[in-house]
């Protein structure tokens, strides 16, 4: 979904009126690294249109975005911000949290749990909070293990933060009960 403010629509229409007929807007969005998306507004000639793009129709123009980027994005908001004597286009990209949750869950499953399984344990992603803290729960040999806190802070949290820079930290919600299956 693309939301364009009234002032941004007017601004873009004014820019496009100076171009040849049939010129529209393309949002060029790139996944530069694991977490950060960058976006540029470019002119887009109707001749470039093909099945790789999703088209959004507005009254005076169309906006094209590559289809494959919508696996990361929930919505895009375009607005105008006045700075000094000039207007500046501001683009805000709202990413899908579900996608981040799936990516972190898969990371835990394949990178973290492959190490924990040597101790007969594993960890599961429970949730990602709005404040970007990951909520985890230990199972098997990790539940009740005296090294669980160290494993959480020095191993799991560091790996997750390194691979997902927007994540602020990790919280363990396990009710640790030492048992025969606990590793230490």
UniProtKB/Swiss-Prot annotation:
Keyword Iron: yes
Keywords assigned: 4Fe-4S, Iron, Iron-sulfur, Metal-binding
Co-factor remark: Binds 1 [4Fe-4S] cluster per subunit. The cluster is presumably bound at the interface of two monomers.
One of the GO biological process terms: iron-sulfur cluster assembly
Entry superkingdom: Bacteria
Matches recorded under SUPFAM superfamilies: Fe-S cluster assembly (FSCA) domain-like, HesB-like domain
Annotated HAMAP family: Fe_S_biogen_NfuA
Entry's family note: Belongs to the NfuA family.
Subunit and interaction comment: Homodimer.
Protein name as catalogued: Fe/S biogenesis protein NfuA
């Amino acid at each position: 979904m693309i939301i364009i403010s009234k002032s941004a629509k007017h601004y873009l229409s004014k820019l496009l009126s100076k171009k040849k007929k049939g010129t529209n807007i393309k949002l060029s969005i790139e996944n530069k690294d694991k977490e950060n998306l960058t976006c540029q507004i470019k002119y887009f000639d109707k001749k470039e249109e093909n099945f790789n793009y999703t088209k959004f129709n507005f009254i005076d123009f169309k906006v094209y975005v590559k289809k494959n980027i919508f696996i990361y994005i929930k919505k895009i908001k375009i607005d105008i911000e006045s700075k000094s004597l000039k207007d500046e286009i501001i683009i805000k990209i709202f990413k899908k949290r579900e996608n981040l949750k799936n990516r972190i869950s898969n990371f835990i499953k394949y990178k973290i749990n492959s190490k924990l399984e040597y101790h007969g344990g594993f960890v599961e992603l429970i949730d990602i909070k709005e404040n970007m803290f990951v909520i985890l729960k230990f199972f098997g040999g990790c539940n009740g293990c005296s090294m669980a806190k160290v494993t959480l802070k020095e191993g799991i949290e560091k790996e997750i933060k390194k691979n997902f820079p927007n994540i602020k930290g990790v919280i363990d919600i396990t009710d640790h009960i030492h048992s025969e299956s606990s590793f230490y």
